Regions:
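Transmembrane helix irregularities
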Residues: 50, 170-173, 284
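Short acidic/glycine- and proline-prone juxtamembrane loop motifs at membrane-interface regions
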Residues: 135-140
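Transmembrane-helix signature of polytopic, membrane-embedded enzymes
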Residues: 108-127
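TM-lumen/periplasm interface segments of multi-pass membrane proteins
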Residues: 18-100, 335-353
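Alpha-helical transmembrane segments and terminal signal-anchor/GPI-anchor hydrophobic tails
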Residues: 29, 35, 54, 59-63, ...
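Signature aromatic-anchored transmembrane alpha helix within multi-pass, membrane-resident enzymes
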Residues: 197-201, 315-336
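Membrane-interface alpha helices of multi-pass inner-membrane proteins
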Residues: 161-185, 202
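Membrane-interface transmembrane helices that cradle and orient dolichyl/undecaprenyl
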Residues: 147-160
Length: 353
């Protein structure tokens, strides 16, 4: 566990410097800022890129790289990526090294570029378990690289670029198409209370309609295996506590942040919509399969990048510090418990270095 703690601490420190722009009143050059940004990426890249048998699906990806002909359920875009890497080397370590560089370099860079407190965003990436999950479902996180950039483009008002990036993500992992929902909701004018009501209605309708939806998924999609194998076991073990945390977060920000910011400020809107979508996904997962909550990862970037924007809109500094501390403690405790109980197979950590 110490390797994760030290790696996170170093990354957060360098991210703080990279986004500070100046130290002791002295403005830092762009070159120096980029250097600190690079240093912030290195701990995650080294930890994940040199790992051996760390991550629940590590062995599966290793076999995929060695024998791609054995695997038929991965998308053509992802398999093309694998074939390109195999043309360079048949050693699966290359796969884990390159995917780690792509995933963590993109996240840190986007955090520095988008977040009002990049250090918080990077820390949140770890304590929300996303870093550990990224060493498991690598193909989905490779798709999320495009989703993170799509989020950035959406905030800048470049909707078509955001949609294009979403489609590129879907070429790697088709489930990435769910991000289109955030794009649509982001462009529609509405009140947060009305959106919350709509989400609640969708959840109720979805739970009632799962008995009709599941047979369709099993018969017509490649995700049917999640309803008839060990994936369908222990449905509520992960989603329930995470659902409660997000519900508390949503209720808290509604009471402590002026609704005009949540409805008009682009970063706050993206955050609020993402939280509501994650609540909806986790509620719907109760009637589907435990792995349905994996859709929430596509909106985790928006939450990590723009949570600081919401916190900064709290006019009462005491409330802001209390909420920030509570969020950090809740997620840290939750993720630590999961990792210590061998969730994501992150422990014991092993590296070839």
């Amino acid at each position: 566990m110490i390797i994760y703690i030290l790696g996170t601490a170093v990354s957060v420190l360098f991210t703080k410097i990279a986004s500070a722009k100046e130290i002791n009143g002295k403005k830092l050059s762009k070159g120096l800022l980029r250097t600190f940004e690079l240093l912030a990426m290195i701990p995650f890249i080294l930890i994940a890129g040199t790992r051996i048998d760390v991550g629940t699906d590590y062995a599966a990806y290793e076999q995929l790289y060695l024998h791609p002909e054995w695997f038929t359920h991965f998308s053509e875009g992802f398999m093309l990526f694998v074939r390109i890497l195999r043309s360079v080397s048949l050693n699966p370590r290359l796969f884990f090294a390159i995917t780690s560089v792509i995933i963590y370099a993109t996240f840190v860079h986007t955090a520095v570029e988008e977040s009002e407190c990049a250090a918080f965003s990077v820390l949140f990436f770890v304590i929300s378990e996303d870093f550990f999950v990224s060493m498991n479902i690598v193909s989905q996180f490779l798709a999320m690289v495009f989703i993170w950039r799509a989020t950035s483009e959406l905030i800048k008002g470049r909707v078509m670029i955001s949609v294009a990036l979403c489609l590129m993500a879907a070429a790697i992992h088709p489930t990435a198409l769910c991000f289109i929902v955030l794009i649509l909701l982001f462009k529609i004018e509405y009140s947060i209370k009305r959106l919350a009501t709509v989400v609640a209605v969708i959840c109720a309708a979805g739970i009632g309609g799962t008995k009709y939806l599941i047979p369709f998924i099993v018969r017509y999609s490649r995700y049917g295996r999640y309803f008839s194998t060990h994936y369908a076991v222990n449905k509520f073990s992960v989603a329930v506590p995470l659902l409660l945390i997000y519900v508390v977060i949503f209720i808290t920000i509604v009471f402590l942040v002026d609704l005009k910011f949540l409805e008009k400020d682009s970063k706050c809107r993206a955050f609020t919509i993402s939280v509501l979508l994650n609540i909806a996904i986790m509620v719907l997962s109760f009637g589907l399969t435990s792995n349905a909550y994996r859709f929430t990862y596509y909106f985790g970037g928006s939450i990590a990048f723009y949570f600081p924007s919401v916190l900064n809109k709290m006019q009462n500094k005491k409330n802001r510090y209390i909420v920030e501390a509570a969020v950090l403690v809740l997620f840290t405790v939750w993720t630590t418990m999961l990792i210590m109980h061998h969730n994501q197979n992150a422990l014991p950590y092993r590296s070839f270095l």
